[in-house]
Swiss-Prot record:
InterPro entries: RNaseH-like_sf, RNaseH_sf, X-over_junc_endoDNase_Mg_BS, X-over_junc_endoDNase_RuvC. Signal peptide: none annotated. Belongs to the RuvC family. Transmembrane segments: none annotated. Pfam families: RuvC. Keywords: Cytoplasm, DNA damage, DNA recombination, DNA repair, DNA-binding, Endonuclease, Hydrolase, Magnesium, Metal-binding, Nuclease. This is Crossover junction endodeoxyribonuclease RuvC. Gene3D superfamilies: Ribonuclease H-like superfamily/Ribonuclease H. It catalyses: Endonucleolytic cleavage at a junction such as a reciprocal single-stranded crossover between two homologous DNA duplexes (Holliday junction). Binds 2 Mg(2+) ion per subunit. Homodimer which binds Holliday junction (HJ) DNA. The HJ becomes 2-fold symmetrical on binding to RuvC with unstacked arms; it has a different conformation from HJ DNA in complex with RuvA. In the full resolvosome a probable DNA-RuvA(4)-RuvB(12)-RuvC(2) complex forms which resolves the HJ. Its cofactor is Mg(2+). The gene is ruvC.
Length: 175
């Protein structure tokens, strides 16, 4: 399974691509950071993010997209930008017809480190170790995106299939 993980952000949006199967080490395919200029108008920043993520989805052709779920932050301006970037990220996968799953930061931390309370340094160290990299992915947004992708490979594939089966059952359809 190839998964594109997205750590949404309006100024820096991390994107990580891995391949793997549950219970096995994943393989790094690529990672990127999409940057927007804070001095640009919001519509231009969102448009740049949309075009960049759409191009990365087309380039890497993932089987699934994993996006970090926006959580409440004290800075309303920051959370608004992150929420807008998250919407663009979800749309990039949905527009391509690819299943999109969202994860809370604690779900990702628990999947990758075994602790939902892990800090950034622990997360980056585990991503580096799990992907057998010679050096940590930089910046942290890229490491976070790779952690999301790893989490989805290990947990999300099953979660997505269960959700699809439940949806089919609700609509009265079989397999």
């Amino acid at each position: 399974m190839r998964v594109l993980g997205i750590d949404p952000g309006l100024t820096r949006c991390g994107v990580g691509v891995v391949e793997g199967v549950p219970g096995r080490p994943c393989t790094l395919i690529a990672y990127h950071v999409v940057r927007t200029d804070p001095d640009d108008e919001l519509p231009l920043r969102l448009l740049h993010l949309d075009r960049s993520l759409t191009a990365l989805v087309a380039e890497h052709r993932p089987d699934g997209v994993a996006v970090e779920r926006v959580f409440s932050q004290h800075n309303v301006r920051t959370v608004m930008g992150t929420a807008q970037a998250s919407g663009v990220a979800v749309l990039a996968g949905a527009r391509a017809g690819i299943p999109v799953q969202t994860y809370t930061p604690s779900e990702v931390k628990a999947a990758v480190t075994g602790s939902g309370q892990a800090d950034k340094a622990q997360m980056t160290a585990m991503v580096t170790r799990l992907l057998r990299l010679s050096e940590p992915p930089r910046p942290a947004d890229a490491a976070d995106a790779l952690a999301l992708a790893i989490c989805h490979v290990w947990r999300g594939g099953t979660r997505s299939r269960l959700a699809a089966a439940a949806d089919r059952a609700r609509r009265g359809g079989g397999r």
